[in-house]
Amino acid sequence: MGRRKKIVQECETLMDDPEHIRNIAIAAHVDHGKTTLTDNLLAGAGMISDDTAGEQLAMDTEEDEQERGITIDAANVSMTHEYEDQNHLINLIDTPGHVDFGGDVTRAMRAVDGALVVVDAVEGAMPQTETVLRQALREGVKPTLFINKVDRLISELQEGPEEMQKRLLAVIQDVNDLIRGMTEEMDDIEDWTVSVEEGTVGFGSALYKWGVSMPSMQRTGMDFGEIMELERADNRQELHERTPLSDVVLDMVCEHFPNPVDAQPMRVPRIWRGDAESQLADDMRLVNEDGEVVLMVTDIGVDPHAGEIAAGRVFSGTLEKGQELYVSGTAGKNRIQSVGIYMGGEREEVDRVPAGNIAAVTGLKDAIAGSTVSSEEMTPFESIEHISEPVITKSVEAQNMDDLPKLIETLQQVAKEDPTIQVEINEDTGEHLISGQGELHLEVIGQRIERNQGIPINTGEPIVVYREAPQEDSREVEGRSPNNHNRFYISIEPLGEDIVETIKMGEASMDMPELERREALQEAGMDKDDSQNIEHIHGTNILLDETKGIQHLNETMELVIEGLEEALDDGPLASEPVQGSLIRLHDARLHEDAIHRGPAQVIPAVREAVHNSLIDASIKLLEPIQQVRIDVPNDHMGAASGEIQGRRGRVDDMYQEGDLMVVEGVAPVDEMIGFSSDIRSATEGRASWNTENAGFQVLADNLQPDKISEIRERKGMKQELNPAIDYF
């Protein structure tokens, strides 16, 4: 029997023993060594050759991943590991570290119970380290730490034992500060900081395949002094043989990460708001493989032979071929064609996948990343909140008109596979817009359409996504219907930043119980009476109904909300989305005859009232900004900081780290287009840098008129603004 077949059989045997299952993700900042580490674990489990581990990058299965040397998609694999005489099944997801692909990390965290955070010993905790930790902790996923590239401290930087200890302790301290800061208000999480003594921190070199932790040193009798001697003498093979990385890391996974039986009672209440007393809630908490089927889809991929594959976590019940299951948000049922598990880029079909495991399913044609799939209709899981929103848009056109239907189908598939991509399809003009997390994100999507689907495309210049927001309180404004029989009286004011953040993070939404929503918003600073009058939340905008006993308003409210959403999706300045508004409906006059207060009357009246209130509230254009970090040799520091300042940016900090200077600052996304080639030439290719989306800020007053005019022209809108907009 082939080795692979044997592993699949071992996995199938262990699937029914949730106490010996570990569902884990490996996450880190870009280039800190996640995928190389994953290769080591696969080699340790006998799934790839030990000789090529670290070079094979077995989880980077896409051609563009191997070309760019970065992980773009999250890849899944199941393997086995013996720990304390007991075989364990480890379902592992290797995630991307580049900020543009953070959506994959967010979705992976929903499927797992533990996150192995990898940090480069030389660079330390970086911006994306903080982001992946936040994503893990928000989902109730327990972290452990592996400090990689320790060989560089010994061989390259020639650090002595004291220097090295100081540096490693500083990395641990930084990670623990982040964990403490993020969990202090989470009542259900005890102390999840990591520690060398407890064995939740490992050190080593994924490239040279050795690793150590406190338990492994006690077991092998090796200490750091001996490791430094072997590393300096270039005896890395002996190091690998005496303290193999895969054993150290997988032992840590088995010992310190919770199994599904321990994890699900804590995680289910965080991600599911259904009836906590129901049988279904019990089945999920107890990982009952005989209960109703509940699958949370975290990823959609396409196999050229099998079609669409939905990957996700089975929280309850057992998945089997032929089952007919409900998919949240769609009517009818989907029939399962096959179930399987992942072995790197390959899917292995199995007969069944019980609760507590990560499964690969075909046949769920209506599922998207984030769907809840179940054998009985149920309250779906909380939607997966992505930490970043799209900030760059590109137009995409097929070079040949004959390819248009195929391109539209491909773009719809892209949006299904990656919910952080927004696709706008215009069948009339043939020009379609895709919005994503950054230039690289959209570049990769464009290349995959051409390479995988064989559709030659033209893409436009990157366009930055703007927002509009009120800056002060408006007066009460009247909106009239075209027939003059209906009137709405509305005022608008800016929402507090904490309230906007609470909505963004999914901690307050219309899907949750009213009392919970009220409490969350009051905690964020909302007035108690206001929190009780909420009628609707759209994006990060809240509608309050402050009317008293108005006839026919109840049956008209749906149209009011429709008019409100239309007005907020296309702001009055440049038809960009409005954010952070508190809209008060004070009063309404409605015609008693329903025929005179239909959609054609109510929607324009509300839209007019909302737009005029926003104008009265000094609405301004907001632009997206990015945090920028540049690591550069001392003599190029001036050039690096000049690159930020020359882009309307601001340098917030400069400090020495090892032999490099670090420049940190903030710059507008619009000015960061083309940054990579400019920073390379300014620093003679000596700089490494990282950008991370940091929300939106008000565009400077002197730039507002030109930018509004430019956007309106691009959208084919007339240049004249509403005459009330006179504050420029």
Swiss-Prot record:
Positions of GTP binding: 28-35, 94-98, 148-151
An annotated Gene Ontology molecular function: translation elongation factor activity
Keyword terms of this UniProt record: Cytoplasm, Elongation factor, GTP-binding, Nucleotide-binding, Protein biosynthesis
Name of one Pfam family that matches: GTP_EFTU
Family of the protein in this entry: Belongs to the TRAFAC class translation factor GTPase superfamily. Classic translation factor GTPase family. EF-G/EF-2 subfamily.
Function recorded in the entry: Catalyzes the GTP-dependent ribosomal translocation step during translation elongation. During this step, the ribosome changes from the pre-translocational (PRE) to the post-translocational (POST) state as the newly formed A-site-bound peptidyl-tRNA and P-site-bound deacylated tRNA move to the P and E sites, respectively. Catalyzes the coordinated movement of the two tRNA molecules, the mRNA and conformational changes in the ribosome.
Protein name as catalogued: Elongation factor 2
